[in-house]
Curated annotation (Swiss-Prot):
K(+) binds at residues 260, 279, 281, 284. Its main location: cytoplasm. GTP binds at residues 260-265, 279-285, 304-307. NCBIfam families: mnmE_trmE_thdF, PRK05291.1-3, RPE2, small_GTP. Homodimer. Heterotetramer of two MnmE and two MnmG subunits. Keywords: Cytoplasm, GTP-binding, Hydrolase, Magnesium, Metal-binding, Nucleotide-binding, Potassium, tRNA processing. Its cofactor is K(+). One of its GO terms (molecular function) is metal ion binding. It comes from Rickettsia felis (strain ATCC VR-1525 / URRWXCal2). This is tRNA modification GTPase MnmE. The gene is mnmE. It comes from the Bacteria. GO terms for biological process: tRNA methylation; tRNA wobble uridine modification. The keyword Zinc does not apply.
Length: 480
């Protein structure tokens, strides 16, 4: 296995930059950079990181921009004068904290070195160039450290995906979902199903391969019961309304309604900045304006849309209305706004057909009508009564959005399907599982279960036929 390295922290100015090296030559590289040999595992050392003499004097070594000149007042004590009269020294890169992790007790399961330098672009460039000029070490590919950890059985594929989701998490709920997955929540669920499938296979293989053995007929009843339970569990699990995927990607919220009812003002309020033009002129918003928001820990993708009205002679506005209706139909949550002064005239069939259980109906500009009309609206329409301009009852909008988001993507005891890859293999697994029947040839029936187990194994990255043999010898005394 090759030795690889990369900067694990973001490139740029920061308090600390972290570099990771993994592979059989990790310790040797650390010794070369520091001139020290006696590194004990899992102990932090404060060391000078230098460009080795062989690299400084090599014609192949050249810094990329920005050019960093040698700092002569920081030469190592081993500086000597070469035969040509020039200075030959180890160039100091930085004073850093370093730590060595011995295989297999590391993130990747290999020998690993971490170097913690100051977060300087120049330091990063110098150290990366120094590492690139050392023999038998190369720059890591994207995700290669995590890939090596998976290959060394540090975690399964779902946990690896959980780590990626954790890095990309922007809200508390996304963090909670990612940390549960990275900690093995999905692995435990899928492995439990796979263990039951392997048990079924081992029982059926015993019937097929050892027909003369005294195997009780009740075993087939156990197979049927386990099969039935698995079909129900996986079917119910797939029927989750994409809760985990919604939490990962964000819930789309479309703000729709007739022209000039305050949709753009509401978008600006929710975003806490002016991203949409607000005007008294109807039809100001022509295209969809999008913003991202965290409400109650849930990622919300806001979309302000063109005002919907039945008649418009403007071709561009007509296209905007089409896009608004499409946005509403594909949205997870909808806010439909009306003007309190023009309520009866602004309600049209196109808008009313968009209302469902995940719709928040809002009557805006409530401050512009008489109190007796407010009571009339309360009796006629189930909605929120607000004034975006004067900040009246706007907190109720946020609370309603949070409640719907929680209902659609809130936590349950069972971990969610978090991406399409899992859903794809689970659908395949269920297809093979429902095809299974003991009325069929036992060899074919066993193959259906085997394919189901392989689909589950493809999710976690574990596919091993030897496990089936292990189950057979574990549960039966063959050839006693």
């Amino acid at each position: 296995m090759e030795t690889i390295f990369a900067q694990s922290s973001a490139f740029g100015k920061a308090g600390v930059a972290v570099f990771r090296i993994s592979g059989p030559k990790s310790l040797e590289v650390l010794q070369l950079l520091t001139g020290r040999a006696d590194f004990k595992p899992r102990i932090m050392y404060y060391q000078q990181i230098t460009v080795p003499k062989t690299i400084v004097n090599s014609a192949s070594f050249a810094y990329k921009e920005p050019r960093v000149e040698p700092i002569t007042n920081r030469r190592a004590t081993s500086d000597i004068v070469s035969e040509g009269g020039s200075i030959d020294y180890k160039e100091l890169i930085d004073n850093a904290m370093v730590v060595y992790f011995k295989s297999p007790n590391s993130f990747t399961g290999e020998d690993v070195v971490e170097i913690h330098t100051h977060g300087s672009k120049a330091i990063s460039i110098m150290l990366i160039n120094a590492l690139l000029n050392i023999a038998d070490i190369r720059l890591a590919e994207a995700g290669e450290f995590t890939k090596r950890a998976f290959l060394n059985n540090k975690f399964d594929l779902t946990a690896a995906e959980g780590i990626a989701d954790l890095i990309n998490a922007e809200t508390i709920m996304q963090h909670r979902q990612a940390i549960r997955q990275a900690s093995g929540g999905l692995e435990e669920l899928y492995n439990n199903w796979r263990t039951q499938l392997l048990k079924i296979i081992s029982l059926l293989e015993a019937y097929i391969d050892f027909p003369d053995e005294d195997i009780p007929d009740s075993v087939l009843n156990d197979v049927n019961n386990t099969h039935k339970n698995l079909v129900n569990e996986i079917s119910n699990y797939l029927n989750d309304n994409r809760r985990g995927e919604l939490l990962n990607s964000g819930l789309k919220l479309a703000i729709i309604g007739p022209p000039n009812v305050g949709k753009s003002s509401l978008l600006n309020f929710l975003m806490q900045r002016d991203i949409a033009i607000v005007s008294n002129i109807a039809g100001t918003t022509r295209d969809i304006i999008e913003g991202h928001l965290d409400i109650g820990g849930y990622p919300i993708i806001l979309q302000d849309t063109a005002g919907i009205r039945e008649e418009s002679s403007d071709i561009i506005e007509q296209e905007g209305i089409k896009r608004a209706i499409h946005s509403a139909k594909t949205a997870d949550i909808k806010i439909i706004m009306f003007d309190a002064e023009k309520l009866d005239s602004s309600i049209n069939e196109d808008i009313m057909n968009l209302i469902n259980e995940n719709t928040i109906t809002i009557i805006n500009k409530i401050d512009l009508i008489e109190p007796n009309k407010i009571f009339s609206i309360e009796n006629k329409y189930k909605c929120l009564r607000v004034s975006v301009k004067n900040n009246i009852a706007l907190s109720s909008i946020l609370k309603n959005i949070e409640n719907i988001a929680e209902n659609m993507a809130g936590f349950t005891e069972t971990p969610y399907i978090t991406n399409q890859r899992h859903r794809h293999y689970l659908k395949q697994a269920l297809s093979h599982l429902t095809a299974f029947s003991l009325d069929n040839d036992l060899v074919l029936a066993t193959e259906d279960i085997r394919m189901t187990a392989r689909c589950i194994g493809a999710i976690t990255g574990v596919i091993n036929i030897e496990e089936i043999l292990g189950e057979i010898f574990k549960n039966f005394c063959i050839g006693k």
